[in-house]
Amino acid sequence: MLSGCYGGSRPANIGTAAPTFTVQDSDRKVSLDELRGKVVVLNFWATWCPPCIEEMPSLAQMQQKMKGKGVEVLAISVDADQGAYQDFLKEHKVDLLTVRDADQKSNNLYGTFKFPETYIIDRDGVLRRKFIGAIDWGTPEIQDYLGKL
């Protein structure tokens, strides 16, 4: 496991309903409720966070492999700088559902204190797992776990 970059507040509780939110940035509006019925891999990240950048290809590969099984990655950037965010997406050809929450309202609902921080939400909207720091999303253990939710 890799280290992360610090931020945050109170944590959301595993086994309880995942806090819902809607994020509107310049390109799109995304609501967690829209993803109900899917397993959501909710990833909070930033372009200024080296472990976040290192983790991104692994997330994208897992998404490509697991999308047909009802798994959706929602990657929320906490970048204040819209230009840096847009440039990063283009430069790295990020092929994930991403949105920028510069005010950090969504990650504050989860008490995110380190980036990247990732939450697994089941098809019923229940928070099942939390990962702090970058992980390898390609491991059989992770993919088996996601496939069983």
Model-derived features: where do they sit?
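N-terminal targeting signals for export/organelle localization
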Residues: 1-22, 140-144, 149
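A short beta-strand-turn-helix
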Residues: 20-40
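Short pre-active-site segment immediately N-terminal to redox-active cysteine/selenocysteine motifs
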Residues: 38-40, 44-48, 114
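Hydrophobic beta-strand core positions in alpha/beta domains
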Residues: 41-43, 75, 119-120
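Conserved redox-active cysteine motifs that mediate thiol-disulfide chemistry
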Residues: 44-61
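Conserved segment of the thioredoxin-like fold in thiol-based oxidoreductases
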Residues: 54, 64-105, 112-115
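Thiol/disulfide oxidoreductase modules built on the thioredoxin-like
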Residues: 87-94, 102-147
